[in-house]
Regions:
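N-terminal beta1-alpha1 cap of cysteine-dependent amidohydrolase-like domains
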Residues: 1-166
Length: 166
């Protein structure tokens, strides 16, 4: 919008000898108005393996922010290293969060912490959003807690396990 106020599109079109219609920035202006009008806050925990490098989850962050623009909420992200979540720490770490998101990842590091986060979300009635690995984690947690398969896992993490639910 600042570039358009400086007539950049007119300059570019003129220099390139293009016949350009006037810019319609209605959608942009409406989005900015929605962003400015947000009145509530939502706290989302992202429980992952790469939380020290936020750019690893850039698309997840941007998706949450844009969802907030559309719903009138300022989204605050709490970065949670999966390996720090266990039955003793889950409440302290996740209590203030309005929702828990477990994104994708590879390898078995942090898997048990993610399972504890999914368990906390389910038992405390917190919204849980599992993306890729995060959805697999939800299935593993449910199989362990609700179906009684204490050793439920993914064949990716336990290739010879008796209860490979993924």
């Amino acid at each position: 919008l600042m570039l358009e106020r400086s007539h950049l599109s007119d300059i570019v079109c003129r220099e390139l000898h293009l016949d350009c219609p006037p810019c319609d920035l209605t959608d942009w202006n409406e989005m900015l108005a929605r962003i400015a009008a947000r009145r509530r806050s939502v706290n989302i925990a992202i429980v992952g393996k790469y939380t020290k490098l936020h750019d690893a989850y850039l698309s997840v962050m941007e998706s949450l922010y844009h969802a907030g623009y559309e719903t009138g909420a300022v989204v605050h992200i709490k970065w949670v290293e999966a390996e720090e979540v266990n039955p003793y720490t889950a409440d302290d770490i996740l209590r203030e969060c309005d929702g828990i998101l477990v994104p994708g990842g590879f390898g078995d590091r942090g898997i048990e912490g993610m399972v504890h986060a999914a368990h906390y979300a389910r038992t405390q009635g917190k919204p849980y959003f599992g993306i890729c690995l995060g959805m697999q984690i939800a299935v593993i947690e449910y199989a362990r807690s609700m179906l009684g398969y204490a050793d439920a896992n993914s064949s990716e993490f336990d290739p010879v396990g008796a209860h490979s639910v993924i």
